[in-house]
Amino acid sequence: MTNIRKTHPLMKIINSSFIDLPAPSNISSWWNFGSLLGICLVIQILTGLFLAMHYTSDTVTAFSSVTHICRDVNYGWLIRYLHANGASMFFICLFLHVGRGLYYGSYMFMETWNIGVLLLFAVMATAFMGYVLPWGQMSFWGATVITNLLSAIPYIGSDLVQWIWGGFSVDKATLTRFFAFHFILPFVIAALAGVHLLFLHETGSNNPSGLSSDADKIPFHPYYTIKDILGALILILVLTCLVLFSPDLLGDPDNYTPANPLNTPPHIKPEWYFLFAYAILRSIPNKLGGVLALVLSILILAFIPLLHTSKQRSMMFRPFSQCLFWVLVADLLTLTWIGGQPVEHPFIIIGQLASILYFLLLLVIMPITSLFENNLLKW
């Protein structure tokens, strides 16, 4: 008799995705982040669901409802901090996952990569709206500043901003709709992740060498299930340590002050995972130019497959490209640091140089270096 997992309509989908899936025998721990992102999403949906049971999306009671969750709800503080720090873990995994894709040429799977870029935008939008919900000072002013950027769009800009606000400023209507979108988007993300996997399984996984691994495949279970469990345990350990020992390490103290439209905080800045994009936005003196640079800083990922000039897929055997990749990583860390600094000398010029270098590396230097490497190998 054939095993039920191979015949049952539902079971065979799971079987072909997580059990009998042929996987390359040489994929490293950098391939763990897909499953870790899935775990992060499940953690965020579950903790978010329990938070939504006690949260009220009204400007008068939003801040005190979060206080109520932390003080009066059984383990409410734990749920709240798991959710807040879970977002940080989500973005750490996301950045590492995207970095892995860039390094090993996984972007050559065009459909998978483009859905991944779409997922990145969706997660960033969700995180931004979630940050507004506690209705602290940084929530309110962050929402005001970022939504106001849309007014830079010619002709329709100011109407668009008022349409998003649901009034003439960030107020009750804005908070209510942000809560609604923040609740629904994770389910859209889950559906998109399913499509992401669907396209990945059409081609099979890439591997560190960037060469075809069709001749050497192993079943996903038990080899990679056990490997993913190890990754999951490390993720949960780090998240638990963060939540239990220093839950506010990555947060902003200003968000413990209730939102006050009459009092602007001295330094308005987003959560740490948006700082690199915020630094790029601030490095351009023109408003519309800044908004375009902000969008392009992420959208540029969609053009990476078109900029691939190397005859090799992975950077594993390309030392010059490897050096440039790590320069790009250092540049992004510099931008993250600058995004959290006040707008004054010397931070302005450092931010501008780092922003120029970011776009130059991806659009010009790396493609030219790839051509140079082809030439070295007489390809």
Swiss-Prot record:
PROSITE patterns: CYTB_CTER, CYTB_NTER
Protein residues bound to heme b b562: 83, 182
Plastid among keywords: no
GO cellular component: mitochondrial inner membrane; respiratory chain complex III
Segments crossing the lipid bilayer: 33-53, 77-98, 113-133, 178-198, 226-246, 288-308, 320-340, 347-367
UniProt: heme b b566 binding residues: 97, 196
Any single biological process term in GO: mitochondrial electron transport, ubiquinol to cytochrome c
Topology of the protein relative to the lipid bilayer: Multi-pass membrane protein
Pfam families the UniProt entry points to: Cytochrom_B_C (PF00032), Cytochrome_B (PF00033)
Tree of life domain: Eukaryota
Location, primary (coarse class): mitochondrion
Cofactor note: Binds 2 heme b groups non-covalently.
Residues binding a ubiquinone, per UniProt: 201
Subcellular location: Mitochondrion inner membrane
Annotated keywords: Electron transport, Heme, Iron, Membrane, Metal-binding, Mitochondrion, Mitochondrion inner membrane, Respiratory chain, Transmembrane, Transmembrane helix, Transport, Ubiquinone
A GO term for molecular function: metal ion binding
Cofactor(s) it depends on: heme b
Role of this protein: Component of the ubiquinol-cytochrome c reductase complex (complex III or cytochrome b-c1 complex) that is part of the mitochondrial respiratory chain. The b-c1 complex mediates electron transfer from ubiquinol to cytochrome c. Contributes to the generation of a proton gradient across the mitochondrial membrane that is then used for ATP synthesis.
Subunit (UniProt): The cytochrome bc1 complex contains 11 subunits: 3 respiratory subunits (MT-CYB, CYC1 and UQCRFS1), 2 core proteins (UQCRC1 and UQCRC2) and 6 low-molecular weight proteins (UQCRH/QCR6, UQCRB/QCR7, UQCRQ/QCR8, UQCR10/QCR9, UQCR11/QCR10 and a cleavage product of UQCRFS1). This cytochrome bc1 complex then forms a dimer.
Additional record remark: Heme 1 (or BL or b562) is low-potential and absorbs at about 562 nm, and heme 2 (or BH or b566) is high-potential and absorbs at about 566 nm.
Entry similarity comment: Belongs to the cytochrome b family.
Protein name: Cytochrome b
Record lineage: Eukaryota, Metazoa, Chordata, Craniata, Vertebrata
Gene: MT-CYB
